[in-house]
């Protein structure tokens, strides 16, 4: 145990070094990614990784849990304070598992669930046929209006009245506009449905008060703890007190065994960070940056789903052109800008090709980039898309990107 990682496992040590270098010298615009603080990393890499703790604080199936109970209680109380929730379960290993637990708490297999179409901005766990949600439940999907790119609330109401879902799933993984939670509540009440809001993408914005909160309008709210919340990779469920026992039992022993106590400790650290005034400033800047970047891309001739953004996310639509999302993603990666190919509403191409790319500003805002840098990024994006076959030009952009990254360091000291 006295050896360093580079001595004991040089291959993994080198992979970590190269990944640190990639994050340090490229601009991360994948909307679901962010950079955690070194304090979050310290907690996640702590000795708490050694401890098994099946159960919940003060009700464990193992001894020696006094200290991990402290960490989990802190995570729970901070999460409740952050979102104004009556109950929080912080044990979910991921957003998908948080969603699964809510499905099992609210529905029986075969029940009807109304959720957002994946191609229109939803998530795999909102009813995709390749996912457990699509296999175990009768899924009805709603989408966005073709003309506007906004959620079609009239369609949601029509489908709800027609199919009488047990659960109405709200939230998205690629929807750039503010979601009208009161409108969904009214629709759900007309048919006696419960609501699960998956706020994984916007949780940090909600915590900071720069996006409306779903908590007052939904029986269940799920989220990841990374993305805009800027914590470790993991999941969480918020719910009303009346559903606390069924949610907890559907996480453990329902779908999980032992919780990841080192991750829960890191969640607690990130929640404390999100309660600080600086986090509101950060989240406000995330949205400012996204709006400036969206406007700059439109001015430079790109088409955006819904024409812009209200949150952290931008969806570029190449429909009607020869450019595909796959081509754009590869070209931008060569230019030092990381994005992901993404299906767009009314998609005609394969999910492996797509007609769009998704960009988000949480990670670059964490670096310290602001409006002026977003204008520069828009220039680079358009230059890269105009020169997708020109490796020399893409390499030139990458060099310029690297210089900007040096001005806004992340973990540069870890490379010394």
UniProtKB/Swiss-Prot annotation:
Gene Ontology MF term list: glycine hydroxymethyltransferase activity; pyridoxal phosphate binding
Its UniProt pathway annotation is: One-carbon metabolism; tetrahydrofolate interconversion; Amino-acid biosynthesis; glycine biosynthesis; glycine from L-serine: step 1/1
Which coenzymes or cofactors are required?
A: pyridoxal 5'-phosphate
Catalytic activity, as annotated:
(6R)-5,10-methylene-5,6,7,8-tetrahydrofolate + glycine + H2O = (6S)-5,6,7,8-tetrahydrofolate + L-serine
Into which EC class is this enzyme placed? transferase
- Give the signal peptide range: none
**What Enzyme Commission number(s) apply to this enzyme?**
2.1.2.1
> How is this protein annotated for GO cellular component?
cytosol
Keywords for this protein: Amino-acid biosynthesis, Cytoplasm, One-carbon metabolism, Pyridoxal phosphate, Transferase
Q: Which residues carry this modification: N6-(pyridoxal phosphate)lysine?
A: 227
Ligand binding ((6S)-5,6,7,8-tetrahydrofolate):
118, 122-124, 242, 350-352
Please give the start and end residues of each transmembrane region.
none
Q: Where found in the cell? A: Cytoplasm
Which residues are listed under the site Plays an important role in substrate specificity? 226
Q: Which InterPro entries does the annotation name? A: PyrdxlP-dep_Trfase, PyrdxlP-dep_Trfase_major, PyrdxlP-dep_Trfase_small, Ser_HO-MeTrfase, Ser_HO-MeTrfase-like, Ser_HO-MeTrfase_PLP_BS, SHMT-like_dom
Which NCBIfam families is this protein grouped with? Answer: PRK00011.1
What the protein does comes down to:
Catalyzes the reversible interconversion of serine and glycine with tetrahydrofolate (THF) serving as the one-carbon carrier. This reaction serves as the major source of one-carbon groups required for the biosynthesis of purines, thymidylate, methionine, and other important biomolecules. Also exhibits THF-independent aldolase activity toward beta-hydroxyamino acids, producing glycine and aldehydes, via a retro-aldol mechanism.
**Assembly and binders:** Homodimer.
- Protein family (similarity comment): Belongs to the SHMT family.
Name-wise, this protein is Serine hydroxymethyltransferase
Which organism is this entry from? Syntrophotalea carbinolica (strain DSM 2380 / NBRC 103641 / GraBd1) (Pelobacter carbinolicus)
């Amino acid at each position: 145990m006295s050896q360093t990682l580079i001595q004991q496992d040089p291959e993994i040590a080198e992979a970590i070094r190269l990944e640190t270098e990639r994050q340090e010298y490229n601009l991360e615009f994948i909307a679901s990614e962010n950079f955690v603080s070194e304090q979050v990393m310290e907690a996640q890499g702590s000795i708490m990784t050694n401890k098994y703790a099946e159960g919940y604080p003060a009700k464990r199936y193992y001894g020696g849990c006094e200290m991990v109970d402290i960490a989990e209680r802190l995570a729970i109380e901070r999460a409740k304070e952050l979102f104004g929730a009556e109950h929080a379960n912080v044990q979910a290993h991921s957003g998908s598992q948080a969603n699964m637990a809510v499905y099992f708490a609210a529905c029986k297999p075969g029940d009807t669930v109304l959720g957002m179409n994946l191609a229109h901005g939803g998530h795999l766990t909102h009813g995709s046929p390749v996912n457990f949600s699509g296999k175990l439940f009768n899924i009805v999907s709603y989408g966005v209006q073709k003309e506007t790119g906004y959620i079609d609330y009239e369609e949601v109401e029509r489908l709800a009245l027609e199919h009488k879902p047990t659960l109405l799933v709200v939230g998205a993984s690629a929807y750039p506009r503010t979601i009208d939670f009161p409108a969904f509540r009214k629709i759900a009440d007309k048919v006696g449905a419960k609501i699960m809001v998956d706020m994984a993408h916007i949780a940090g914005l909600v915590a900071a008060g720069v996006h409306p909160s779903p908590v007052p309008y939904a029986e269940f709210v799920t989220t990841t703890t990374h993305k805009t919340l800027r914590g470790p990779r993991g999941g969480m469920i918020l719910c009303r007190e009346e559903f606390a026992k069924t949610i907890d039992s559907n996480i453990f022993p329902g779908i999980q065994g032992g919780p990841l106590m080192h991750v829960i400790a890191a969640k607690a650290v990130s929640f404390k960070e999100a309660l600080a005034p600086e986090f509101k400033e950060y989240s406000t800047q995330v949205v400012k940056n996204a709006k400036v970047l969206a406007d700059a891309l439109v001015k430079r001739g790109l088409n955006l789903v819904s024409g812009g953004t209200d949150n952290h996310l931008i969806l570029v639509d190449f429909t009607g052109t020869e450019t595909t999302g796959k081509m754009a993603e590869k070209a931008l990666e060569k230019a030092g800008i990381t994005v992901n190919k993404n299906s767009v509403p009314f998609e005609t191409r394969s999910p492996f090709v797509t007609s769009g790319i998704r960009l988000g500003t949480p990670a670059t805002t964490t670096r310290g980039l602001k409006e002026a840098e977003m204008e520069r990024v828009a220039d680079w994006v358009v230059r890269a898309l105009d020169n997708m076959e020109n490796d020399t030009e893409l390499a030139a952009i990458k060099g310029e990107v690297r210089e900007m990254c040096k001005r806004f360091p992340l973990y540069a000291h870890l490379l010394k």
